Amino acid sequence: MGCCQSRIDSKEIVSRCKARKRYLKHLVKARQTLSVSHALYLRSLRAVGSSLVHFSSKETPLHLHHNPPSPSPPPPPPPRPPPPPLSPGSETTTWTTTTTSSVLPPPPPPPPPPPPPSSTWDFWDPFIPPPPSSSEEEWEEETTTATRTATGTGSDAAVTTAPTTATPQASSVVSGFSKDTMTTTTTGSELAVVVSRNGKDLMEIIKEVDEYFLKAADSGAPLSSLLEISTSITDFSGHSKSGKMYSSSNYECNLNPTSFWTRGFAPSKLSEYRNAGGVIGGNCIVGSHSSTVDRLYAWEKKLYQEVKYAESIKMDHEKKVEQVRRLEMKRAEYVKTEKAKKDVEKLESQLSVSSQAIQSASNEIIKLRETELYPQLVELVKGLMCMWRSMYESHQVQTHIVQQLKYLNTIPSTEPTSELHRQSTLQLELEVQQWHHSFCNLVKAQRDYIQSLTGWLRLSLFQFSKNPLVRSSYESKIYSFCEEWHLAIDRIPDKVASEGIKSFLTAVHGIVAQQADEHKQKKRTESMLKDFEKKSASLRALESKYSPYSVPESRKKNPVIEKRVKVEMLKGKAEEEKSKHEKSVSVTRAMTLNNLQMGFPHVFQAMVGFSSVCMQAFESVYNQAKSIGEDQEEVKRLLP
């Protein structure tokens, strides 16, 4: 029996169906892993931003910041004097249009229009806050008017303009680039540079970075809906992995993963996403992706069992046919021969039923693949494209925001790092570590998913009732789509982004290590001071015992003098330890700012590069699917 079973499994069609079933089983698990990885990555973005805000709230009072230097005005034409530079301390800059005064020089050229997504400078992004407001629409109208006015005045002009009364809500999310406190300079290459006129502390800068972490996380909401993440993630709690809860109630709320899902989430994003690109080829998504994959797996298991059963019937049928042939050659008894023939007919009937079951299962798989799976896959690619485009824009703005860190400096501080500050730094290190871990898992999950899907498609395109070399146009479409997707995922340079996050993790770990050294030095200083106070009290007691008029028994040994010498030595050591602690505090402050200044640009530049490549890769795959769908619609319209 075992030998017969082995012979059945060795059949090509059985082994093919077994491999198909195995690939689809992996696809079911890969889809679940992708959902979890996607959710955890979005959660990590929110958590890193929240941890940075909490960390900076403890660090900001220990730093002194200064305003950035005033930018020099653009070089004017020879006959025109340059406009006077603006004072860095001024809170607003008066703008006057060219129509209000003929004394002022003509206006400068307006900032260039926003470049395409592939550009490395997304100039207008810093002016776009997440929640739109009416005041910002007025600002855009004023900018458009100024642009039209300045178009005919030449490219070498310089001007100051005066806006209408600004409301408190008119400030940008990136407050350093606020409309009433900015200066735009234009060089010969027409590259607009925005310079902040406001001095900011670390807290304000980090809050802006956090806003775009939230924006990046919110961009994954439509894809979360497609992946049905709400039913996939169940391990939501307010506790960190170390099992600690922090005393600040606001911080506990920020670190609660449930709040990460709701904080700054825009409900309209999903509807905007669905209306963004239309429907590919007139198809609509039927059912959920999870349900579709599960049903495909159920049909693949049924198909495997039916094919395996059919092959066993074929083997029995061949044996019975051979038996009938031998009986006829031997001219055996009529009853035996007829019985064998009836067995053959029975097996043929069973084989016919089994073939119908195989065809039915195969048709159901094809139907699910055509009507549900392919439209869902196109929507997934569209969701990935939109998500990485938004993340590219968010990380690009963050790259510009963190440039303001170079305008911060530290002063020697005697204020030690508090325990809450140390805990917030440890939490930041943990969240950055989780960011790196979730990023690597997300990339791996995407690769495993498309690899399992492509492997299953490669085998499932084989038709049992057709020539295996013949493929329909639809089969070629879905297979070429997934192959292109597979190649795009393989070409993504995730190592660079991973190393960028690791470099930032190393910078944060350096701060943690320095704070730990400072804490140890503080303990040593406190211990030394405590010992000094104890010895000083003992010396005072000894001095009161041996008054100046009392004569010791032995003039060779004076206990007061010996004790005083020891106390003086201990005092020197205590002062030395105190000096070391103060120096350690200053080193901590300087290292904190230096590591942030060095680490932030690297990680955001790496993420900008990665998200840009992802955006372009998925856009290419999506556009290919869209063009194929449009071509097929055109063919349908041309056919009678």
Curated annotation (Swiss-Prot):
Name of the protein described by the UniProt record: Protein ALTERED PHOSPHATE STARVATION RESPONSE 1
Mutant lacking the gene: phenotype: Defects in primary root elongation and enhanced root hair elongation.
Compositionally biased tracts (Low complexity): 88-103, 144-173
GO cellular component, one term: nucleus
Keywords carried by this UniProt record: Coiled coil, Nucleus
Disordered, as annotated region: 60-175
Biased composition regions of type Pro residues, renumbered to the chain: 68-87, 104-118
UniProt feature coiled coil, ranges: 336-371
Function: Required for the coordination of cell differentiation and cell elongation in the root tip. Required for the coordination of cell processes necessary for correct root growth in response to phosphate starvation, through the modulation of the auxin transporter protein PIN7.
Subcellular location, record wording: Nucleus
Major localization listed first in the record, in broad terms: nucleus
Taxonomic classification: Eukaryota, Viridiplantae, Streptophyta, Embryophyta, Tracheophyta
Tissue: Expressed in the root tip of primary and lateral roots, specifically in the meristematic region, including the quiescent center and lateral root cap cells.
Induction: Down-regulated by phosphate deficiency.
Any Pfam family the entry gives: DUF630
